[in-house]
């Protein structure tokens, strides 16, 4: 059981490191569709019609 937890944590850490490294590169096409403002980096999971990315922070409401 402990080994399973350690392996899961290791996979999560490696995945986070890959996303951090990929943040310096251009967004893949499938990630561009998740953010309403794909020009900002660091908001790869802004979802919903009112969500947007300003200053690399995801906001629930953005004035137009």
Swiss-Prot record:
Identify the stretch annotated as signal peptide in this record.
Answer: 1-22
User: In the UniProt annotation, what is the result of changing residue 64 to S?
Assistant: In cal6.4b and cal6.4c
List where in the cell it is found: Secreted
Top-level taxon of the source organism: Eukaryota
Propeptide-annotated positions? 23-64
Post-translational modification (record): Five different peptides have been sequenced after total venom examination by HPLC-MS. cal6.4a-4c are identical in length but are differentially hydroxylated and brominated.
Q: Which residues carry this modification: 4-hydroxyproline?
A: 49
Modification type 6'-bromotryptophan: residues: 44
List cystine links.
Answer: 43-53, 46-58, 52-62
Entry GO terms, CC: extracellular region
- Molecular function GO labels: ion channel regulator activity; toxin activity
User: Which terms are listed as keywords in the entry?
Assistant: Bromination, Disulfide bond, Hydroxylation, Ion channel impairing toxin, Knottin, Neurotoxin, Secreted, Signal, Toxin
* Tissue spec: Expressed by the venom duct.
Its biological purpose: Probable neurotoxin with unknown target. Possibly targets ion channels.
Q: What's written under domain?
A: The presence of a 'disulfide through disulfide knot' structurally defines this protein as a knottin. The cysteine framework is VI/VII (C-C-CC-C-C).
Give the UniProt family note. Answer: Belongs to the conotoxin O1 superfamily.
Specify the protein name. Answer: Conotoxin cal6.4a
Q: Which organism is it from?
A: Californiconus californicus (California cone)
